[in-house]
């Protein structure tokens, strides 16, 4: 009969049903029987007493007591012998699997197959892990460890003597077993020593330990069911623990339960979800503020323990639950001022009674409110790092920042209150940490956003709470708030150079973001952070890079092209903007870094809403480089005497690559627009260059795009004028200022000012005739095209000679008289072989025969030509 249709409701029937279920789970092995015999055996099982349930059930017959049988039962008994149920308990089955694995290891030892030994050893460790949960270490396992260790030592000893090496598979298997066995043997060293001392005595009691009392387990399951029912009928809180024990939650037992949870913290096989449920019930039955504070402190810590992996992040549900519980904790400690949570407090050891607090005194509870809010902040950041920023989920997750900011401000108010009480000896560093967190949440935001965020925060904070650092209603704008927070950190961070430096970088970033270039520049220069930033941590270096870039963008918005280019040069010229600004990892560098370094770099990435637009950054950098490099190209082309200098190697490489292209189509991206504009500006077509620059759509991302475009037009006109004068000055005797003014659509006064500046800086060999409003160029200063090419050839020839001299010196190191030539031809200068000397120099006369071979590095085609002319 199926067990679902039995009408018997007695406890014995219930236990037998549990036994049948357990037997099914443990793979019941039975021989075929007739249906009538199965019915008889099941009816007999119903009448079986509890004593029979204590047997192991392996190879036993099931049925009624032998003394209660009549003669008619003999036939059924004899027929029942033919189909006996063989029931193996879970523990017995695992022991058999363990013995089979140990036997497989022995077989691998016989054929010296370390590959199979390694695989079976891993399997053995997995199997024994399940058995260790229910009792002591199996002695079969200890025996296998000891014998495997002996065989491994024997094999290693043979390898030292035998010159023949193992194959690669065996060698890898041996090394793997060696490492794993070393770790495993330490954990069971005592048992291994006992086994080696007396193997027979150690293995005697093994059979008794192998037998697993299956029916008792079924009975305990039935008892657990009864306890669950009893617990449900009870009025108080109760839950079922291990072994079916009912846990009763009362206010008196809260501290004991918390101690149990704290002791199990960090251990393996700890069900944190179950602990969280228990603590939620404990909070509901908590009767005093002290109990609530203790439960909340432990509960929040346990929630954070659920995400200890480096690649995982706290789920939104868990984060919101932790944030809500943290807000509740703040409310409790704000209401009950006699209890304070500080890091320096001693734990309360007596779980039987609650602490009593006298009037006017304060009781310290160990904990850290600041660490909790920092962890909430870090978990939110990690969550934003892993979410796709182009989805609605990111926006939804970002909305949690306002709740976090409210908790940060409330934590700051609480720490201010604690720091006023000198008896608590709370370090100033804790308050500085939370002030720094508040500053880091506002420094990169626009003023309007900060104002709304701060106003909503004070509305959510209870009216009786106020701050001494930023009093309620005193902060009218974002700039005042940032200045107050930064000044507080400047004053109260003695011995905390890193915190002070980060506060200064945040303030510089804020000033640059709001177009206060000169103040941001002066603060950056006066701080001297560029001299010590290499000694700071990576996060501070990233903040420094972000601040430097923001100062450069601020200079560009102010029309200071040279300052913007020099500021952005270090970041944009490296080609590693993503890494330096923590906005991504360069793909081509994956093969150059270890997985740990790559993981750390990904952990340092900033959330998407804090990113600086890299395309805009590149556009600004290339535009500034164009406005500086194109006039410099024209100047060096017409005046070779000027020392060649490179402002931006990155820009020059891009420009050279663009010029090498045979066919250039219309510009498609930002870089193409700048390159086309550069080409037009070099040809004097400033209007065309302006059109290319204005057609870049990235300018729309700036705060005032029309003003930016107007500024760029003026800059292109001025640099176009300079480029024109540098390029075509050799072809003019005089040039009217009015003509230049009409060509470049600039006022006469502006043209005269630009020309005067060029003349005063000795960039242009000319004079300005203010009476006739014209420019008079001086002749003989500029070189012709032939002269320029001759000078270029001379420079290359001298460079070739110096290169050959260095090569010869490298090859003849340590050789005496290496530079002494036969016939008195020596080095440069002097009476022997020098330039202009009497013998053998350039232009000199020498009657000595030339030596054949490669030791003479002067001469060649150029030397022969000089010699023939001489």
UniProtKB/Swiss-Prot annotation:
GO molecular function: RNA binding; translation initiation factor activity; translation initiation factor binding
Stretches assigned to the PCI domain: 608-782
Gly residues bias: start-end ranges: 824-844
Cross-referenced Pfam families: eIF-3c_N, PCI
Compartment annotation: Cytoplasm
Listed Gene3D superfamilies: Winged helix-like DNA-binding domain superfamily/Winged helix DNA-binding domain
Residue ranges with Acidic residues bias: 14-54
Keywords: Cytoplasm, Initiation factor, Protein biosynthesis
GO cellular component, one term: multi-eIF complex
Recorded family membership: Belongs to the eIF-3 subunit C family.
Function according to Swiss-Prot or TrEMBL: Component of the eukaryotic translation initiation factor 3 (eIF-3) complex, which is involved in protein synthesis of a specialized repertoire of mRNAs and, together with other initiation factors, stimulates binding of mRNA and methionyl-tRNAi to the 40S ribosome. The eIF-3 complex specifically targets and initiates translation of a subset of mRNAs involved in cell proliferation.
Protein name as it appears in the record: Eukaryotic translation initiation factor 3 subunit C
Native source organism of the sequence: Sclerotinia sclerotiorum (strain ATCC 18683 / 1980 / Ss-1)
Primary gene name: nip1
């Amino acid at each position: 009969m199926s067990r679902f249709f039995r009408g018997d409701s007695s406890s014995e029937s219930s236990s037998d049903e549990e036994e049948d279920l357990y037997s099914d789970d443990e793979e019941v092995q039975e021989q075929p029987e007739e249906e009538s015999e199965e019915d008889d055996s099941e009816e007999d099982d119903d009448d079986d007493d509890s004593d029979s349930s204590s047997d192991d059930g392996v190879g036993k017959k099931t049925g009624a007591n032998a003394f209660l049988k009549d003669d008619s039962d003999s036939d059924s008994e004899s027929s029942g012998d033919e189909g006996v149920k063989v029931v193996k308990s879970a523990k017995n089955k695992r022991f058999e699997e363990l013995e089979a694995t140990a036997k497989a290891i022995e077989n691998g030892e016989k054929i010296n197959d370390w590959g199979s030994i390694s695989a079976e050893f891993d399997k053995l460790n997995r199997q024994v892990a399940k058995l260790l949960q229910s009792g002591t270490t199996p002695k079969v396992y200890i025996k296998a460890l000891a014998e495997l260790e002996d065989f491994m030592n024997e094999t290693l000893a043979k390898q030292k003597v035998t010159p023949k090496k193992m194959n690669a598979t065996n060698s890898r298997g041996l090394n793997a077993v060696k490492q794993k066995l070393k770790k495993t043997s330490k954990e069971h060293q005592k048992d291994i020593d006992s086994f080696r001392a007396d193997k027979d005595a150690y293995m005697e009691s093994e059979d008794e330990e192998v037998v697993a009392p299956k029916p008792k387990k079924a009975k305990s399951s039935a008892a657990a069911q009864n306890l669950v029912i009893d617990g449900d009928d009870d009025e108080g809180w109760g839950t079922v623990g291990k072994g079916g024990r009912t846990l009763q939650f009362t206010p008196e037992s809260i501290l004991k339960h918390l101690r149990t949870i704290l002791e199990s913290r960090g251990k393996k096989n700890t069900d944190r979800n179950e602990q969280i449920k228990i603590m939620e019930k404990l909070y509901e039955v908590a009767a005093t503020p002290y109990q609530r504070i203790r439960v909340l402190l432990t509960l929040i810590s346990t929630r954070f323990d659920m995400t200890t992996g480096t690649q995982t992040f706290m789920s939104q549900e868990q984060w919101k639950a932790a944030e809500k519980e943290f807000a509740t904790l703040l409310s409790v400690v704000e209401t009950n001022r006699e209890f304070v949570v500080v890091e320096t407090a001693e734990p309360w050891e007596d779980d039987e009674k609650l602490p009593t607090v006298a009037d006017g005194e304060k009781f310290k509870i160990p904990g850290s409110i600041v660490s909790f809010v920092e962890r909430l902040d870090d978990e939110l950041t990690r969550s934003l790092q892993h979410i796709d920023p182009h989805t609605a989920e990111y926006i939804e997750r970002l909305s949690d920042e306002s709740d976090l900011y409210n908790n940060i401000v409330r934590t700051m108010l609480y720490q201010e209150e604690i720091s006023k009480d000198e008896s608590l000896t709370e370090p100033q560093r804790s308050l500085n940490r939370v002030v720094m967190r508040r500053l880091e949440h506002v420094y990169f935001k626009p003023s309007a956003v900060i104002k709304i965020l701060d106003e909503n925060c004070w509305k959510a904070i209870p009216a009786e709470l106020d701050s001494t650092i930023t009093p309620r209603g005193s902060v009218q704008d974002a700039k005042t708030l940032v200045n107050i927070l930064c000044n507080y950190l400047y004053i109260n961070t003695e011995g905390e150079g890193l915190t002070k430096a980060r506060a200064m970088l945040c303030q510089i970033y804020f000033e640059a973001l709001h177009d206060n270039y000169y103040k941001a520049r002066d603060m950056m220069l006066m701080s001297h952070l560029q001299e010590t930033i290499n000694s700071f941590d990576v996060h501070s270096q990233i903040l420094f890079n972000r601040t430097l870039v923001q100062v450069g963008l601020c200079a560009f918005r102010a029309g200071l092209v040279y300052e913007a280019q020099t500021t952005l040069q270090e970041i944009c010229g490296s080609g590693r903007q993503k890494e330096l600004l923590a906005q991504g990892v360069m793909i081509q560098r994956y093969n150059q870094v270890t997985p740990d370094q790559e993981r750390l770099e990904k952990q340092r990435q900033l959330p998407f809403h804090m990113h600086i637009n890299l395309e805009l950054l590149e556009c600004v950098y290339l535009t500034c480089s164009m406005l500086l490099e194109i006039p410099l190209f024209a100047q060096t082309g017409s005046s070779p005497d000027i020392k060649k200098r490179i402002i931006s190697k990155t820009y020059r490489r891009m420009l050279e690559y663009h010029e090498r292209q045979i066919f250039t189509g219309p510009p498609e991206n930002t870089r193409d627009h700048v390159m086309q504009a550069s080409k037009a500006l070099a040809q004097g077509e400033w209007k065309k260059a302006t059109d290319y620059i204005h057609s870049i759509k990235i300018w729309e991302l700036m705060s005032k795009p029309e003003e930016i475009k107007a500024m760029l037009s003026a800059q292109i006109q001025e640099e176009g004028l300079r480029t024109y004068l540098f390029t075509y000055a050799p072809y003019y005797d005089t040039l009217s200022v009015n003509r230049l003014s009409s060509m470049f659509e600039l006022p006469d006064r502006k043209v005269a000012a630009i020309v005067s500046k060029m003349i005063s800086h000795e960039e242009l060999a000319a004079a300005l005739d203010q009476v006739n409003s014209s420019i008079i160029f001086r002749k003989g200063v500029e070189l012709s095209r032939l002269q320029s090419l001759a000078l270029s050839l001379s420079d290359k020839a001298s460079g070739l000679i110096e290169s050959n001299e260095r090569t010869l010196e490298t090859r003849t190191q340590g050789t005496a008289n290496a530079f002494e030539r036969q016939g008195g031809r020596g080095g440069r200068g002097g009476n022997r072989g020098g330039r202009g000397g009497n013998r053998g120099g350039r232009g000199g006369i020498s009657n000595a025969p030339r030596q054949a071979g490669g030791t003479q590095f002067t001469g060649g085609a150029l030397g022969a030509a000089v010699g023939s002319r001489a």
